[in-house]
Swiss-Prot record:
InterPro entries: Aminoacid_DH-like_N_sf, NAD(P)-bd_dom_sf, THF_DH/CycHdrlase, THF_DH/CycHdrlase_cat_dom, THF_DH/CycHdrlase_CS, THF_DH/CycHdrlase_NAD-bd_dom. Its EC number is 1.5.1.5, 3.5.4.9. GO terms for cellular component: cytosol. The keyword NADP applies. It comes from the Bacteria. It comes from Ruminiclostridium cellulolyticum (strain ATCC 35319 / DSM 5812 / JCM 6584 / H10). Homodimer. SUPFAM superfamilies: Aminoacid dehydrogenase-like, N-terminal domain, NAD(P)-binding Rossmann-fold domains. Belongs to the tetrahydrofolate dehydrogenase/cyclohydrolase family. It catalyses: (6R)-5,10-methylene-5,6,7,8-tetrahydrofolate + NADP(+) = (6R)-5,10-methenyltetrahydrofolate + NADPH; (6R)-5,10-methenyltetrahydrofolate + H2O = (6R)-10-formyltetrahydrofolate + H(+). This is Bifunctional protein FolD.
């Protein structure tokens, strides 16, 4: 393997250490940050993610409020809880763990969160501010990808960046953040013609489609940087990404692994957004 493996775990620890120092300073002034996490139903993957987030909060001194609601929770009950948290001064950030049950309107739930407590940066107002280049918060996974690139000395400005995937959570905001860093950005999706050729034009290739090992070596230009955001389970039940890691690592100059890559950075950016929310709400 010739590619450098970009270590998200190490960088996330560094980010969180910096945040802990800032949060300790806030606490010395009587300001105690709090993040509310709502999970509806008992999806095992969601439960793992929520536990990770709770541990991150504990690590850096943010109080974690967890609301584990049954699958049968009505939309009205969930919206009522969000309204209560919107009006709770001890809660600075609110996160609803997705996915939520199909009988609840996801868009309505996201829009119900107060924009200044929107730790995930999913609220339409925050997405709009992101689009015009004046964000209060940054979407967690895309921001984590950019920080991982920059902290490893990987140039973005003037580079051809290809994003595979057009979701509202990763693909679209990822393209916006790369564009803000002066990259030339192309988005690929299921209807893209000659997707292999387009991917091969990338200096930086970010893949977020949730298709197990979709990106093969022939999709990658020698020396390209490959960021694998996707996570799924292979036939053997093991976690795999959207990229054929071992094979692509022989061609790329830098690459992320499924574990210890983008995931820890996503959570570190959630902590950063929660800290920003505290500053925003306290006029700091």
């Amino acid at each position: 393997m010739s590619a450098k493996v970009l270590n998200g775990t190490e960088l996330a620890a560094k980010v969180k250490a910096g945040l802990k120092a800032k949060i300790d300073e806030l606490k010395s002034k009587g300001i105690n940050p709090g993040l509310a996490v709502i999970i509806v139903g008992d999806d095992p993957a969601s439960r793992v993610y929520v536990n990770h987030k709770k541990n991150d909060c504990t690590e850096i001194g943010i109080k974690s409020f967890e609301y584990a609601l049954p699958e049968s929770t009505s939309e009205e009950e969930l919206l009522d809880l969000i309204e209560t948290l919107n009006n709770d001064a001890s809660v600075n950030g609110i996160l609803v763990q997705l996915p939520i049950p199909k009988h609840i309107n996801e868009e309505k739930v996201i829009a119900a969160i107060s924009p200044d407590k929107d730790a995930d940066c999913f609220h339409p107002m925050n997405v709009g501010k992101l689009m015009i280049g004046k964000p209060e918060f940054l979407p967690c996974t895309p921001a984590g990808v950019v920080e991982l690139l920059e902290e490893n000395g990987i140039e973005i400005s003037g580079k051809n960046c290809v994003v595979v995937g057009r979701s509202n959570i990763v693909g679209k905001p990822q393209a916006i953040l790369l564009l803000a860093k002066n990259a030339t950005v192309t988005i690929c999706h299921s209807k893209t013609a000659n997707i292999e050729e387009v991917c091969r034009s990338a200096d930086v290739l970010v893949v977020a489609i949730g298709k197990s090992e979709f990106i093969k070596p022939e999709f990658v230009k020698p020396g390209a940087v490959v960021i694998d955001v996707g996570v799924s389970r292979g036939a053997d039940g093991k976690l795999v990404g959207d990229v054929q890691f071992a094979e692509v690592a022989e061609i790329a100059s830098a690459i992320t692994k499924v574990t210890g890559g983008v995931g820890p950075m996503t959570r570190a950016m959630l902590m950063k957004n929660t800290y920003k929310a505290v500053l925003l709400q306290n006029g700091l």
